[in-house]
Amino acid sequence: APSLSAMSDVEQGMDAYQVRRGNPNLKSVTYFTNRFSVSYRNKWMNVDLSARYSYDDKPIMEETIFENGKFVRTYANQKGLHRLMCQTSIQVRPFKEYLSINMTPFFNRYISQGNAYLHTHSNWGFRGSIVGMYKHWVFMADMNTSYHDLEGETITKGESIHSIALGYNKGKWAVQMMVMNPFTDDYHQGRENVSKLAPNKQLAFSKDFTRMVMLNVSFNLSFGKQKQMA
């Protein structure tokens, strides 16, 4: 849902060249969604295939115009927004409960139809994890590539992240050590505005989230008497 400032006749300066303006004439939006899924299961593996298509009719999305020497970023009911999201989830258990391998490749396709623009964007990605257990020991590793989203004229690019963890669980107490992003020197996410009039990019990055070590210790404390009821 749009914010109150987007629906009001209010203008706010962003910098020397840009202003943000609301639109009190915004109208309601109609949404359509279709889903498809199929699954296969046996003793050693699970396979899930899913797809979702959604269409927003006359969605409220951004647009940029040039007025009085400044770029005005405002909102309007645009023509349409198409989203197609497909993924295949595969779980393999080669050694029963001792080892589980999960792999999920995905594909997203976006078509943003504005009154004065047309933008398309495709996003291929992958999520995966490995969980191994033996007696009291637990090993985990996972990774996620960047997940993108296009709405209006803005592409949002999420984080790419991976981790490795080793833990020991004794029942009443457990300890786990995890390393975040051990195989990269850079952590980042960003936004890109693809307007023809005033495109821009924003990138947030940090080296503090690479090779970050975390230690987690937990205890199960019980007090008082315990009785078993027949």
Predicted regions and their residues:
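Transmembrane beta-strands of outer-membrane beta-barrel pores
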Residues: 1, 11, 32, 42, ...
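Outer-membrane beta-barrel signature, preferentially recognizing the C-terminal barrel domain
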Residues: 1-48, 55, 73-84, 203-211
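Outer-membrane beta-barrel translocator domains and adjoining extracellular loop/strand segments
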Residues: 3-11, 17-20, 51, 59-68, ...
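Outer membrane beta-barrel strand-and-loop segments of large Gram-negative receptors
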Residues: 21-23, 27, 46-103, 113-119, ...
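Residues on the lipid-exposed face of transmembrane beta-strands in outer-membrane beta-barrel proteins
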Residues: 26, 36-40, 51, 86-94, ...
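Residues that define the transmembrane beta-barrel architecture of outer-membrane proteins
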Residues: 30-34, 43, 80-86, 118-126, ...
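Outer-envelope beta-barrel architecture signal
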Residues: 43-47, 84, 95-101, 124, ...
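C-terminal beta-signal and adjacent terminal beta-strands/loops
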Residues: 170-230
